[in-house]
Structure formats: C-alpha cells, structure tokens
C-alpha cells in the first residue's frame, strides 16, 4: 500500500534533539569499533597473474566485492587509523581500471558473482568477468587527495597516479558528457549508488532496479558493447544526476590541486555553473536531475537534491534556502534520526526496511558526511551538531548498520557496514568545513553566480 504524504504541519527550523537519557557513544569507543569493523572486512591477496589487491568489503558475506564509492569512503576513514591501508584501498581500485581511463563500478577480486546474481551485473558477458562495465559516482580524486593529506610518511602518494586519475576524469567527460554541458550522465540507476531511488521510477519505468525489465536494461547495454555515447544518443533511459555531478565537481577540484592543471579547475567551474543554471528550481528551492535526451527535470525530492550544499562555490542564498526550507523543515528532511534519503512529503517515502527499497526513505551515514560540513560552513553550527548527535545515537543503539529508520532510529539491513564508519571522519575532524580537504578549500575557483 502506498504511504500517503503526511499532513501539513507548521514549518519548523529545529532539528529534533535526541533524548538526554538515550545511549551515547564516546569518540574513543567509536574509533575502536570503526577500526575493528574495517579490519574485519579487509580482504587481500593476488590474482593468478600476480596482481595484488587489498580492499574493504562493505559487509560480507552479502557485500563481499569491491565497490567504487564504498572503497573511496572506506579509504577516507582508514586514513585515520592506517594510512597505508587507505592508500592500498585506492590503488586497488585504480588497478581495476582500463588503459583508457574507465574504472568499474564493482570488482570481483577474490570471489566472482554467484550464478543467480551474475546475469544482473552490468558485465560484458554473463559469467567470468573480473569487473562490471559501468561506472559509479566518481569521487576517487577527492578520496585520493584526502588520503594524501594523511600520508606524511609517503608524500609521493599525492602525485604517483596523477596521469591515471586524469585519464579517468577525461574518460568521463568524453563518454558521459556527449552534449558538452559539463554534466555527466548515468545510464543505469545503480551507477549513482542510489539504485532504487524513487527519482528513477518514471525514467526507467519497467526497467528500473529489481523489476523484471532490469535484466533487459543490462542486456541492451551488453549488445551495444557498453558504448556510452551510443546508449545516450539512442535511448531516453539516462540521467544527468545531481549527486553524481556534485561529487564529479568536487573530485575535479581535487584533481586540479593534485595535478596542478588548470583545465580541471575550469571543468569543475563549468559543472558547478551547469548545476545552478540547469538543475536549480527557484520556485521549488531544489535541484532536480535531468532525464533523457530532452533533459526533463525529475521533480522528486530526495537527498540528491540537497547535495549541491557541499559545493563551496554555491551561492550562499541558495545554500541557506536548502538548509532552512528543506534540511531543517520537519515536513521534509528534519527527522529525529539523521537526514532521510527521501523527503517525508513524497508519496514514495518509506522509513523502514524492504529488500528492494533501501533508498526510498531510510537514513544513510554518507548523507550526513556530505551535508553536515556544508551546514557548518554556512554557520548552522548548532543545528549540524544536533544532526551529528542523532547519527551517533544510531550507532550507539544499533552499531554500524547499512541504514536506519529516520523516524524511530531502528537499525536496518546489513550489519558491520563499512561506510557507516564515516562518522569517525566527522567526529575526528569537526573543523572540516567541506569534503574538499581540511579547510573545505575549493582551490582558485570562482563563486558560481545564481541564475
């Protein structure tokens, strides 16, 4: 049964305060638990050809492979405990890439996909693939810069892979931005990492995640050899995704600093400008994804629409509107526990667990990791600390779960989930004002003008 939108309530700018009597978690305990989890989930070895690997499984046995953005998040936390492992995590991801700069969504290093699941992975053939043929939200250069800052014992790490990183982001521009507007496209819903988000329902229709047609979506890509430009030019099932492009812009800025090459700063400027000019809806006070060849706005309110808060160049008036009208509004994203993945006003909102509905309401830690520092930068210190406290309470109650119910705080889905340890990064580095390094610096970028 579809959940009706909640009745209108008076708008509030207050985030619910966790009860003083509830459990709390101290930073030393949080650190110990996080490090134990990451070490528990670590896998290392060599392929038959001698290629070494070392990475953190998100949550074995279900999530036992290497996923692109999971590994980036894991490395960001590893740097606080074991910078050498953080470096190896990212080097392993880079080793899975092709010579042309493509880096896959999922890599099956030590344990290939089972026969039931294999046909649904976006691979070149149904079986016997080392990796998928699709991308994921491209934050590798951002993670690389953060790990490099925590690697005084190996200063050369910052520049050792600059050429490979440049190839990666050049491939994304060439293959996923055929119209040259600065916004890259995804061609499958799981490429953003938000697999079953309701914002994809209309775009992918019967081919969306976990429906029978999803197999055809994968098979269609196989038949076209995963030629991104051909798929984008021929079909309408592709999206210029706001969240993907926010991380793309942040990573381009990191790459500009790592490489010293101005063209990546200029590309970041263009992407951020495009997000404001093409995706910002002044009336709704939200950023919308753009779907298909005609770039139709997807007017579904998810946390992706809040993600541009993380851009240091975002016009302050837009940032404050997002915080005050969305994040701190109890009708929308202000819930007792964290920031939900979908606005409470959306008919598709589901707070609890469902096998195929993980991005349709529950709270995820990476959301807070991206948005809380942005709120600090805008001066919402008290509000951001209260949201952080609610995330800490979730972990104190239920441990590092895959996601949580934003209304009652119940821990849901996978246990010992790797990227939920991102809370450590927020707690250990409260001075961090953004995801672009300790000070939130955006390099030499110009502030994007509101359109």
Regions found by a protein language model. Give the residues of each.
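Compositionally biased, low-complexity flexible segments
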Residues: 1-11
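Extended glycan-interaction surfaces of carbohydrate-active proteins
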Residues: 16-66, 90-130, 181-239, 272-363, ...
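Alpha-helical scaffold segments in carbohydrate-active enzymes
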Residues: 36-37, 92-99, 146, 164-178, ...
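Aromatic- and histidine-enriched alpha-helix N-cap/loop-to-helix transition segments
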Residues: 65-73, 81, 131-139, 160, ...
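Alpha-helical support elements that line or immediately flank enzyme active sites
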Residues: 70-101, 304-315, 368-381, 388-391
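Short glycine/serine- and small hydrophobic-enriched flexible loop segments
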Residues: 76-79, 141-150, 250-260, 310-313, ...
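Internal, well-ordered domain-core segments that constitute the primary functional module
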Residues: 136-191
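Long, repeat-rich segments with strong aromatic
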Residues: 237-259, 264-267, 271-274, 313, ...
